[in-house]
């Protein structure tokens, strides 16, 4: 993917992992973060040199950009830099970028050739679309979270994203076939 430029607006695991794969394949990836706290994985232990080791692993070979998308200046900066990129990956709940004035249609108006990838917990529409979705949410909905620790203590959060990984295998187990996905 040499010559392909990617702008990553995601946090935690799914988006940073997707952009890491693109970086490993040769794309130039710029990761955009809020001024503070940035990607929450930065603060998650274990850490090395004050940075979460998971964050370091998922964001190696990426250039960091700090832009406050909650400010008009930050949104204007995003509008200005979008034409430099071939791909934009975002992990906001549906409608968030629209409220900021930089939804998918607005981004494509700025750059008609832009590929926009939206990563959400529950899709772009439907009854759960506006909810945040993370591994812990999926474990709770599946009834698994209650067995991750002693009954008299809060659930133990797994170091690995069990629900995310289990979801990869669900179709094969249920239907007896694999899945081909093209990005």
Predicted region positions:
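N-terminal helix-loop segment corresponding to the beta1-alpha1 unit
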Residues: 1-183
């Amino acid at each position: 993917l040499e010559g392909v430029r990617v702008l990553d607006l995601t946090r935690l695991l799914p988006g940073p992992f997707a952009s890491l794969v693109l970086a490993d394949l040769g794309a130039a990836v710029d990761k955009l973060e809020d001024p503070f706290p940035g990607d929450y994985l930065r603060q998650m232990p274990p850490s090395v040199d004050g940075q979460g080791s998971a964050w370091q692993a998922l964001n190696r070979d990426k250039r960091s950009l700090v832009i406050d998308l909650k400010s008009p200046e930050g949104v204007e900066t995003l509008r200005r830099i979008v034409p430099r990129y071939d791909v934009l990956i975002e992990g906001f709940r549906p409608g968030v970028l629209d409220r900021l004035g930089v939804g998918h249609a607005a981004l494509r108006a700025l750059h008609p050739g832009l590929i926009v990838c939206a990563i959400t917990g529950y899709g772009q529409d439907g009854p759960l679309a506006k909810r945040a979705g993370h591994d812990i949410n999926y474990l709770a909905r599946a009834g698994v979270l209650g067995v991750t620790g002693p009954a008299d203590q809060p659930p133990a959060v797994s170091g690995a994203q069990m629900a995310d990984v289990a979801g990869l295998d669900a179709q094969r187990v249920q239907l007896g076939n694999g899945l081909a996905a093209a990005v």
